Swiss-Prot record:
One of its GO terms (molecular function) is monosaccharide binding. This is Glucose-6-phosphate isomerase. Belongs to the GPI family. One of its GO terms (cellular component) is cytosol. Catalyzes the reversible isomerization of glucose-6-phosphate to fructose-6-phosphate. Its EC number is 5.3.1.9. Its main location: cytoplasm. The active site is at E351 (proton donor), H382, K510. Pfam families: PGI. Keywords: Cytoplasm, Gluconeogenesis, Glycolysis, Isomerase.
């Protein structure tokens, strides 16, 4: 047994998990359950009443958090302690949205001052592009932005830009490129005019394979349209810490925005990585995004565990993964603008908590990060919701919906809400055999067939869900929502005693990909790897099967 599983609270939860009643019974026992098990913070309301949890469950979960020293770990992250122990780094994405007067010291430097300088630089740049002062090489204003990145430098800007579509200023269009598949960038460049296109390249090292390959192809396209090398500076900017490589590429040093080691890619949209967002919605809205996240930071840092929204969500996820063998978690967004959030949260959670070794190098003997997946309502109801209702796997769900739509036409939004709330009720309540049979009472079917069909219409219920509501989707509420999931991810990793801020599996994939690339471009067939890899490489070299 590991240190975690030996904790008294862990062992108490293991015993308690076998005695929790069906949620139908819990709602009968606790008529005021919604009032007792919902909380508001930062413009969000969390209803967690539809969980397999009694008051005793909550007490035990918070006891585990306290026994795991969660509060101390939260404070250590905010203080800039080196909690990323495998890379010897602080973890300070929270500093990216801290107010100007905040002081956070990293190796003798107040990083908040550096962040504010970068935000001011972004503001000047965004203003020059959106007002038309920034001119392309033929004197025309910029109309299109192509954002080139991968991972966090792609997903964050893309999903936030998509979510904030109602706040676009209208001066620019933005196109996001990540995949190294040439089709991706070719399709994005179709119809663009090199004279009015600005490229934003995001890579800390200015050497990430996918990002550099796509940027070089973008540059080739740009030059092929009649531009020259000296024109590159008017159409390419970078977010990178490698100024030398960026300037060698042709980017003006004044148009290189910094990145820092204390920010991981999946937590970086709040930095200059978010430049495409700012170009689309303006710096005022970008700062509102930061303000919403900062408000959630304060809530996470200062609120007691029992009413702390990220803690509640993180502990429930752990509850199902470790004591009910839940292997996945679904995020369901009932707002079209938020349709990309499940993919963003997927990277955030799975890259952070997809670990099997504790901070001190011990193999874990408990489940860690679940598979995160999902989509937008109501589309999912006609696809995978069937599995949620009647499948054999337990899949906890998060439902996310604004109470007010940006596009309130006809009965659309009330129907959307009815589906959202109806799904949470159906998952919790289910349908018994007697209820299903009663529904068939007026049918002319023979009794034997009614019995058969009723059996197929039974739904066990007791399927847990959280519901997150906001008055309206705004930059502020979006910032708070994303920060909520960041901190929820931290809570789980802190309890599991893993490092949520490295990604060695990703690094191995890069390394082996480069090894294979060498063999794909070699003069002779591959013979030195396993037989499967050798065969696949050689088939590719032959261009046929």
């Amino acid at each position: 047994m590991t240190e975690l599983t030996q904790l008294a609270s862990w062992q108490a939860l293991a015993l308690h998990s076998k005695t929790v009643p069906h949620m139908r019974e819990l709602f009968k026992q606790q008529p005021q359950r919604f009032d007792d098990m919902s909380t508001k913070a930062c413009g969000l309301l969390l209803d967690y009443s539809k969980n397999r949890a009694s008051t005793e469950t909550l007490s035990l979960l918070f006891a585990l958090a306290k026994e795991s020293k969660l509060e101390e770990k939260i404070k250590a992250m905010f203080a800039g302690s080196t909690i990323n122990n495998t890379e010897q780094r602080a973890v300070l994405h929270t500093a990216l949205r801290a107010p100007k007067d905040k002081v956070i010291d990293v190796e003798g430097v107040n990083i908040v001052a550096e962040v504010q300088q970068t935000l001011d630089k972004m503001e000047g740049f965004v203003g020059s592009v959106t007002t038309g002062d920034w001119k392309g090489y033929t004197g025309k204003t910029i109309t299109d932005v192509v954002s080139i990145g991968i991972g966090g430098s792609f997903l964050g800007p893309k999903i936030v830009s998509q979510a904030l579509r109602p706040y676009w200023t209208g001066q620019l269009n933005c196109h996001f490129v990540a995949n190294v598949d040439g089709t991706s960038i070719i399709e994005k460049l179709k119809g663009l005019n090199a004279e009015t296109t600005l490229f934003v390249m995001s890579s800390k090292s200015f050497g990430t394979q996918e990002t550099l390959t796509n940027t070089l192809s973008a540059k080739d396209w740009f030059l092929a349209q009649g531009a020259t090398q000296s024109d590159v500076a008017k159409h390419f900017v970078a977010v990178s810490s490698n100024v030398a490589k960026a300037t060698e590429f042709g980017i003006d040093a004044n148009n290189i925005f910094p990145m820092w080691d204390w920010v991981g890619g999946r937590y970086s949209l709040w930095s200059a990585i978010g430049l495409p967002i700012a170009l689309l919605v303006g710096m005022d809205n970008f700062r509102e995004l930061l303000a919403g996240a900062h408000e959630m930071d304060n809530h996470f840092l200062e609120t007691p565990l029992e009413s702390n929204m990220p803690v509640i969500m993180g502990m429930f996820s752990l509850w199902y993964g470790n004591f009910f063998n839940a292997q996945s978690h679904v995020v369901l967004t009932y707002d079209h603008y938020l349709r990309g959030l499940p993919a963003y949260f997927q990277q955030l959670d799975m890259e952070s908590n997809g670990k099997s070794v504790t901070l001190n190098g011990t193999d874990v003997d408990y489940s860690t990060g679940p598979v995160i997946w999902g989509g937008e309502g109501t589309n999912g109801q006609h696809a995978y919701h069937q599995l949620l209702h009647q499948g054999t796997a337990l899949i906890p769900a998060d439902f996310i919906m604004p109470l007010n739509s940006h596009n309130p036409i006809g009965e659309h939004h009330v129907q959307l809400a009815s589906n959202c709330f109806g799904q949470t009720q159906a998952l919790m309540q289910g349908r018994t055999f007697d209820e299903a049979l009663a529904e068939l009472s007026t049918s002319s079917l023979p009794d034997s067939e009614k019995q058969l069909i009723a059996q197929h219409k039974v739904m066990p219920g007791n399927k847990p869900s959280n519901t997150l509501l906001m008055d309206k989707l705004t930059p502020t509420t979006l910032g708070a929502l994303i920060a909520l999931y960041e901190h929820r991810t931290f809570v789980q990793g802190a309890i599991w005693q893993i490092n949520s801020f490295d990604q060695w599996g990703v690094e191995l994939g890069k390394q082996l990909g480069n090894d294979v690339l060498d063999r794909l471009t070699a003069q002779a067939d591959a013979t030195d790897l396993d037989t499967s890899s050798n065969a696949l490489i050689n088939l590719f070299r032959q261009n046929k099967i």
